[in-house]
A protein has these predicted regions:
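Catalytic-core regions built around general acid/base machinery
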Residues: 80, 104-117
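C-terminal and late-domain segments of enzyme folds
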Residues: 1-28, 39, 43-50, 54-55, ...
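Short, well-ordered alpha-helix to beta-strand connector turns
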Residues: 61, 84, 116-117, 158, ...
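Portal/gating segments that form or line small-molecule/metal binding sites
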Residues: 39-102
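Catalytic nucleophile loop
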Residues: 88-90, 113-132
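Short, active-site-adjacent cap segments at secondary-structure transitions
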Residues: 95, 126-129, 198-200
Length: 219
């Protein structure tokens, strides 16, 4: 299984190179499906969403399709994913994304699809790949989902936890001591990555790709 777990998407040349190394094709020969449901519940200005798509457009891909699994039937989105090289899971709310991965049935068939495709996660799209969504830590670090009382099982593709947006002014990931305190009771390795960093994962083997900052806990 090949995964590229990012905080902010394809934000620099190093992350772009990692993507095409995983795909094994040139950009102009690569097709991508953009999967946006995590963003649907986020309020306010969506300039970040537009910027994520612009970054993809600037890669000069063969094709960028959009398939919202919360809005269209499986018979419409599945053939498009089967024809793509990259499945790109946009950021937003990780719980909303995981709910629709389950409701749509995509969570069940992703392991088969990923035998031949590359999974790319952006923020929430990266967070859902762990064994669970780390509710308590997410509440502390992102100040969201306070109404939730129970954690949610993730895709369980990786055996670590991914926390995006290190040093972002919008979240509580500005200080290392806050993050360290928040994740101290997590059993397993923790990566906190800024928007210029990513993890390239091939069959469980992890490579850090970064032109920015990142922190690793519980090594």
């Amino acid at each position: 299984m090949k995964l590229l777990l990012t905080s902010g998407g394809i934000t620099n040349k190093s992350i772009a190179n990692a993507l095409f190394d995983l795909v094994g094709k040139k950009p102009e020969d690569t097709s991508l499906v953009f999967i946006p449901p995590a963003s649907n519940v986020e309020k306010g200005d969506k300039d970040w969403f537009i910027n994520d798509l612009v970054n993809l457009k600037n890669l000069n891909l063969k094709e960028i399709d959009i398939a919202d699994i919360s809005a269209i039937d499986k018979k419409l989105w599945l053939p498009r994913m089967e024809d793509a090289d990259v499945l790109f899971f946009e950021g937003g709310n990780s719980y909303h994304l995981m709910e629709w991965l389950n409701k749509s049935g995509l969570a069940q068939i992703l392991p088969e699809l990923l035998k031949t495709k590359v999974y790319v996660g952006l923020s929430a799209g990266s967070m859902v790949t762990g064994k669970d969504l780390a509710l308590i830590q997410s509440q502390i670090l992102y100040g969201e989902d306070w109404e939730r009382k129970e954690d949610m099982v993730g895709l369980n593709f990786v055996d670590f936890y991914f926390f995006p947006h290190l040093n972002s002014p919008y979240f509580n990931l500005r200080k290392e001591d806050i993050i360290k305190e928040a994740v101290k009771n997590i059993k397993g390795k923790v990566f906190a990555m800024d928007d210029n960093s990513a993890l390239k994962v091939i069959d469980g083997k992890i490579e850090i790709i970064s032109e920015g900052k990142y922190l690793v806990f519980n090594e």
